[in-house]
């Protein structure tokens, strides 16, 4: 950063005592410096409204004297601007340019994600997210290791990976690590987190063997990457005429990891007809029954929904927050337990933390509802489903088919 003497105008020079680029603290120090400048410049000098979001410190909300709100999202050295007034955004960009040496980029591309706008029908725009360039570059690196057949699903139906499976030797682990297993798994993770939610279960399974891969894990990782590559022009779609409030679907498998007895759960939060957050993960605790696993999954999904509600509220986007966010699951006992307090031999041992979902229902933040198993779109986050089910579930979750805007609760007695 260039600085000049306030009286003489002479350029000042600094002595670098320590190179922090690559240091674990470098990103934090840079973010701290950047935020102090933003607060000083926009809040005190320009008299703008300034608010660094508590729910996500990477987000800063700036409000001009005209009352126009703009969003600044900072990813270390990549910054995105979003808002409804282009002039205000260009003004903010110019303030950054005067202080830092910045290069303006094409907003269609960011962190390997391509964003396109199109009309799905007259006066109904949509935003489509894809990763074609990223997947093409990654696939070329490992093309000779891929099978020629095009997979119809990310994972073989019913596949389940766990540490110590197939009794692989240390030599086998080292072989697949040298082949680039971790790089492929990382690429799959980036794709699954951004444009391929249907690959989240398989990627979570593969990442369990990140340090000690075997042939089965290698085949699954290559299959997921191949699946993404052949669907690289497909992605997530958000529609202007889609459901304009938060909805959440959650589910859990009852098939446990043989090494620790813990099952896989998953959830997805949707808005404007597409997913805005999703996850597939192994439970932290052993589930004794299917309803126990489902109830724990509901608790995790509730925490994600509560965070999202508070973030949207902080962004002054309260119109997208329903009075009570619908939480859709397919287990009667889990739904009932979240709605009323009842102690039975089957649930009296549940850890207290998992009753957080009941508190959210009681306070009116969420509304738990029972949906049919075939309409539970989070099912694909808990197991490797057949192609016909993956197409049915995936098309809805990714915004290429309509979500139910209103799912009436089932009467449970």
Model-identified regions with their sequence ranges:
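Catalytic palm subdomain of template-directed nucleic-acid polymerases
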Residues: 24-25, 62-101, 116-128, 208-215, ...
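RNase H-like nuclease module associated with reverse transcription
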Residues: 209, 244-245, 284-413
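Electropositive, glycine- and tryptophan-enriched low-complexity nucleic-acid-binding patches
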Residues: 270-291
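Acidic carboxylate-rich catalytic motifs and surrounding loops in phosphoryl-/glycosyl-chemistry enzymes
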Residues: 48-51, 57-58, 104-116, 151-153, ...
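C-terminal reverse transcriptase regions that engage the nucleic-acid substrate
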Residues: 16, 20, 105-233, 372, ...
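Conserved pre-motif C helix in the palm subdomain of viral-like polymerases
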Residues: 1-4, 8-93, 99, 134, ...
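Polymerase palm active-site segment centered on the conserved acidic dipeptide of motif C
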Residues: 46-55, 80-140, 225, 229-234, ...
